Curated annotation (Swiss-Prot):
Key component of the proton channel; it plays a direct role in the translocation of protons across the membrane. Belongs to the ATPase A chain family. Keywords: ATP synthesis, CF(0), Chloroplast, Hydrogen ion transport, Ion transport, Membrane, Plastid, Thylakoid, Transmembrane, Transmembrane helix, Transport. The gene is atpI. This is ATP synthase subunit a, chloroplastic. It is found in: Plastid, Chloroplast thylakoid membrane. The lineage of its organism: Eukaryota, Viridiplantae, Streptophyta, Embryophyta, Tracheophyta. It comes from the Eukaryota. GO terms for cellular component: chloroplast thylakoid membrane; plasma membrane; proton-transporting ATP synthase complex. It comes from Ceratophyllum demersum (Rigid hornwort). GO terms for molecular function: proton-transporting ATP synthase activity, rotational mechanism. F-type ATPases have 2 components, CF(1) - the catalytic core - and CF(0) - the membrane proton channel. CF(1) has five subunits: alpha(3), beta(3), gamma(1), delta(1), epsilon(1). CF(0) has four main subunits: a, b, b' and c.
Length: 247
């Protein structure tokens, strides 16, 4: 019977496919600290793309916008509308924060699908989208938490903490717990979706190298953009909620 050898070969093939280095990391040793180099390298590339694009956008503005200037003005208007819808009339000071979050996450997500990170060999692990790492998404979520605390305290002072006993003091533990669940949901939603998308593409390429992975890659680009929009929308909604003081 050839059932056992076939089963062993199948398991071996699945093991090779599952050998994607998800938990492997490349570190820089600086003093007594280990710095997660993979995330820094890819984040610097994303930041360079954003800064380069911004420099091109403002280099020579025209009264009658060109195609490139039209695109950047559309992006800015989109971010303003998003901020105004979620935050309200006091949205102005928060447009740079919401815009930075949206653009960084959007470009990071797309870089995982469009940039050939895998051709750069590292001693350990491999390069991937910055948002493919839980450290990045947690940092973004904590920045969002700090932003909505700052917004609430700036607007209401110490009276901001009165929201924890509204509409009744019985809800105090739940209201406190909510401040922990917000960054958790933001970070794990973004991390899980981007990681799953990249793993699905890697597995499909390993199984069927031609044609089949292409629709999945396009779907990944779409969902990557949606995830950036969801994160920015929720961040703006949390800031607006803290300034208004209602749930």
């Amino acid at each position: 019977m050839n059932v056992l050898p076939c089963s062993m070969n199948t398991l071996k093939g699945l093991y090779e496919i599952s050998g994607v280095e998800v938990g492997q990391h490349f570190y820089w040793q600086i003093g007594g600290f280990q710095i997660h180099a993979q995330v820094l390298i890819t984040s610097w590339v994303v930041i360079a793309i954003l800064l380069g694009s911004a420099a091109i956008a403002v280099r020579n503005p025209q009264t009658i916008p060109t195609d490139g200037q039209n695109f950047f003005e559309y992006v800015l208007e989109f971010i303003r509308d998003l901020s105004k819808t979620q935050i309200g009339e006091d949205y102005g000071p928060w447009v740079p924060f919401i815009g930075t979050m949206f653009l960084f996450i959007f470009v990071s997500n797309w870089s995982g699908a469009l940039l050939p990170w895998k051709i750069i060999q590292l001693p350990h692990g491999e390069l991937a989208a910055p948002t493919n790492d839980i450290n990045t998404t947690v940092a973004l979520a904590l920045l969002t938490s700090a932003a909505y605390f700052y917004a609430g305290l700036t607007k209401k002072g110490l009276g901001y903490f009165g929201k924890y006993i509204q509409p009744t003091p019985i809800l105090l533990p739940i209201n406190i717990l909510e401040d922990f669940t917000k960054p958790l949901s933001l970070s794990f939603r973004l991390f899980g979706n981007i990681l799953a998308d990249e793993l699905v593409v890697v597995v499909l390429v390993s199984l069927v190298p031609l044609v089949v992975p292409i629709p999945v890659m396009f779907l990944g680009l779409f969902t990557s953009g949606i995830q950036a929009l969801i994160f920015a929308t929720l961040a703006a909604a949390y800031i607006g909620e803290s300034m208004e003081g209602h749930h």
